[in-house]
Curated annotation (Swiss-Prot):
Positions with a binding annotation for substrate: M45, G194
Disulfide pattern: none
UniProt cross-references to InterPro entries, sorted A to Z: Hyethyz_kinase, Ribokinase-like
Name of this chain's protein: Hydroxyethylthiazole kinase
Source organism of this protein record: Aliivibrio salmonicida (strain LFI1238)
Entry keyword annotation includes Iron: no
Higher taxonomy: Bacteria, Pseudomonadati, Pseudomonadota, Gammaproteobacteria, Vibrionales
Record key words, sorted: ATP-binding, Kinase, Magnesium, Metal-binding, Nucleotide-binding, Thiamine biosynthesis, Transferase
Pathways per UniProt: Cofactor biosynthesis; thiamine diphosphate biosynthesis; 4-methyl-5-(2-phosphoethyl)-thiazole from 5-(2-hydroxyethyl)-4-methylthiazole: step 1/1
Any single GO BP term: thiamine biosynthetic process
Residues involved in ATP binding: R121, S167
Family: Belongs to the Thz kinase family.
């Protein structure tokens, strides 16, 4: 995927306004729903198993975020993945805090194993832990650099036959065909809770219109976050400015600002 294809994907997303089913955490529901709306997608936060078969029959993609995981949520997540598979829909998994507890690590691996078409989006420590290596994390925050997770991402991509997105100071996307390096974003972004969860939700929106790599969402959020941070005094205003920037983001801005390197 190149810059022009990312621009075309954004235009298609805004035209089609895909419905994205989110089983996500309590902390970020408002953030991620607003980000999806600002970009042009249609979010629904559906957590009931009783309606999931219907939801997956007409939605574009399924986003699963294990940020506030518990025994009530887990069977719902597994059932949702089953329904996504039955309807040939992409599953986007955010393994929040993978490596911080056995519950999170095991659940993330089980979901990844179950999904037929999968994108995994996490920080470096989460991806390293998912691969079964020793990671440095503090709760859900990464202490590993994104560069250090590249080997783990390649392993995870092979293990689960999926695309892997590593968020960090530098973002990486690993697919079967290529590795992508993206150098946008801003150092202020990690000070807003749920920024990675927003990244995952946007990945679901682009997956719903055909980008099964995660590259388009990574590019769009990186450029939008960079611009929004330049206009912000701190994390509070960054949250608001990010929504405005996602809404206003255009072809010329992406073309001029995106820093994308592709290694095929």
């Amino acid at each position: 995927m190149n810059t022009q294809e990312i621009i075309e994907a954004l235009a298609m997303l805004r035209e089609k306004k895909p419905l994205v089913v989110n089983i996500t955490n309590y902390v970020v529901m408002n953030n991620t729903a607003n980000a999806l709306l600002a970009l042009g997608a249609s979010p629904i936060m559906a957590h009931s198993q009783q309606e999931m078969a219907e939801m997956m029959s007409f939605s574009g993609a399924l986003v699963i975020n294990i940020g506030t995981l518990d025994s009530v949520w887990t069977p719902r997540m597994h059932f949702a993945v089953e329904q996504a598979n039955l309807n040939n829909k992409v599953v986007v998994l955010d393994p929040v805090g993978c490596g911080a507890s056995q519950l999170r690590t095991q659940t993330a691996r089980q979901i990844a194993e179950a999904a037929n078409t999968l994108i995994i989006r996490g920080n470096a420590s989460e991806i390293i832990a998912l691969a079964g290596e020793n990671a440095q994390s503090k709760g859900v925050d990464a202490l590993d650099s994104s560069d250090s997770a590249l080997g783990a991402a390649c392993y995870v991509a092979q293990q689960y036959q999926c695309s892997v997105v590593i968020s960090g100071e530098t973002d990486y996307v690993v697919t079967k065909e290529a590795q992508y390096k993206l150098n946008n974003g801003h150092a202020m972004m990690p000070f807003v809770t749920g920024m990675g969860c927003t990244h995952t939700a946007l990945t679901g929106a682009f997956a719903a219109i055909g980008d099964h790599s995660g590259v388009a969402a990574t590019a769009v959020l990186g450029v939008a976050g960079e611009i929004a941070a330049e206009q912000s005094a701190g994390p509070g205003s960054l949250q608001i400015n990010l929504l405005d920037t996602l809404y206003q983001l255009d072809e010329e801005t992406l073309m001029n600002r995106l820093k994308l390197t592709v290694n095929a």
